[in-house]
Amino acid sequence: MSSDRATIISPTQLIICVALFIGLFNNYSFFSQVWAIYPPSGDNLLFVGSLFCVLLLFTALLISVFAVGPLLKPALIATLLVSANTGYFMDTYHIVIDDVMLDNMLRTDRAEAFDLLSASQALYFIALGVLPSVAVAFAPVWRTPYLKAARARLGFLCACLFSITALLLLQGSSYASFFREHKSVRFYANPSYAFYSVGRLGAGLFDRATRPYLQIGLDANRAASSTRRKIVVMVVGETLRADHLGINGYERQTSPRLWQSDAISFNNAWSCGTSTAVSVPCMFSFLNHENYDQAEALATDNALDVIQRTGVSVTWLENNSDSKGVALRVPSLDFKHAETNSACDSECRDVGMIDGLAAILEETTEGDLLVVLHQMGNHEPSYYKRYTQEFERFAPTCQTNQLESCSREEIVNAYDNAVLYTDHFLGETIEWLNQLDN
């Protein structure tokens, strides 16, 4: 064999190299979970080694299905870039990349996306995504006739399946226990679970697009009332924990204005999820926590639709990313830009929406009125950006979006300062409403 021939690798070898690289460098979160369950010892080392081989073979199997012919290098590069990005967010924020998280990413606006960027992310992405992708792009690969390449790929797929099966059977009891008792660990397998989540998201989006829209509450009406119009303001918050509100007994008084206003706190309320894409549509849907289905909720009238149909003027004011489908059929105003929000500095503040309330009141002179304010609130991870300087009551604070570089005290202080600002916003809203009463 010539020296030139010896430096050229086969498509199968390139796939194995990429799968090995991902297994070694982009699965820190996965193996952190595994080592927490199986501390290093004789039998555990054997099982974890077997698990690594299964992960490697399954990744190679998954890549082999798509990395065929002219798609070989593009598919490998895409896999490397996806696994690097997935690995960064799992390693840094200790999250899993499921279909809900991907849905959030699709709905993320530019400001939110830039809020997540950091030097550490860039370095991580370059080292574990871009550089190996460049190596793949310039790797010399054998060119073989189509039928011969197809036979080789089929043989490799069969070899992967056989090897995975053999490994599972050799330690059957260990794998049975692992899959039965530690199901959540699979969420950290990179990139296989991310690819699975893409499939689930695609199926969910197709379901939403093809599901017929259902109107409900067509017989809803308002009972006769006094001639005095009713004006209701509803605030949809963002990432505000109930146990960090002074009004709920938190050790710090983070809600002095709510306390002074004699506000009532309904503390037996629960969100359907921890992401905006789930919690906001659920909040306004007629489904409950137990039977909530995203596709059904978005294809059915929500509370705003029914209220509007009864003759109430409904308006949605937006200072977050968007309404996640809730306000598609009611008037909405965007307050994320200085052109519409009078309280913008480094970012547009929630209090700017109060001017919007006054404008809506001037335009809607008759009938009952419901205005929903969707605030930026404590949107993570840049808590220090969510309040102005005069509300930095608790110090020192975390002054970066790289929360892993801050102490818990600094993160909590920045978070609580943002809660204070939300309390200020709510206090200003209540004061505006009180002026209407007067």
Task: Give each language-model segment a name.
Residues M1-Y188:
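Transmembrane and membrane-interface helices of multi-pass
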Residues G23-A36, D207, E390-L403:
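Short alpha-helical hairpin
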Residues S41-V48, S346, I411-Y415, V419:
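Membrane-interface anchor segments at the N-terminal boundary of transmembrane helices
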Residues L57, T108, Q253, L298-N302, ...:
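Short, conserved clusters of charged catalytic residues that mark active-site
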Residues V65-P74, A78, Y93, V306, ...:
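Catalytic cores of PAPS-dependent sulfotransferases
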Residues A113, L328, I360, T429-W432:
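Short alpha-helical functional segments enriched in proximate histidine and acidic residues
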Residues L168-V235, T239-Q399:
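Active-site-proximal alpha/beta segments of enzymes that process anionic O-linked groups
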Residues A189, D355-A358, C398-N438:
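A long, amphipathic alpha-helix that forms part
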